[in-house]
Amino acid sequence: MALNQRSRTVLTLYSARDCVHCHRVRMALAAKGVAYDHVVVDLDNPPEDLLDLNPYNSVPTLVDRDLVLYDTNVICEYLDERYPHPPLMPVDPLSRARLRLAVVRIENDWLTLVDQIEAGGKAADAARKSLRDDLVKNALAFKASKFFLSPEISLADCTLAPLVWRLDALGVQLPREAHAVMDYGERIFRSQGFARSLTADEKTLRP
């Protein structure tokens, strides 16, 4: 969607203070080293201009001059193409398709559980157990490479690392046999790019 009445010279990101989906976009921006204006959105009282930009009034919303994007995957892939270095997706079609599928699996299998846990209620405990059990079951995938299924950081990491960062805050305690998940997290968390992706609120989610 393009808005001709708006003209911007830098990227503007509308993002919540603590949102796993917004964090994905901030992590991609940090990995690219791209400067941007960050508008922190109170989801209970969003700014009026957000509704003018995005008919769903949702975050994350990215504005690049006259272009407005408001789907997390669309935003992340746009950033990777708009700022090609360092790449966050493989070059060849087969590997790109596999990475996209990994992102879809993380979203559908795990991030939906994060949303359920954060929503609270009776479903939260079941979602917490499902997330814990599924991470344990897939722990070996976290040590197959330095990053998730890749020797280099990718959009899969931008999707997964914000989840791993939140595990303690979500009340998801992993057993020793899933140490590969937390080892993966520590490798990511030590990077300057990850530190730059955090809001002040998100920095408090881990001791």
Describe the residue ranges of each PLM region:
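Non-globular targeting/processing and membrane-anchoring segments
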Residues: 2-3, 202-207
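GST-like domain detector, emphasizing the conserved glutathione-binding G-site
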Residues: 1-135, 139, 146
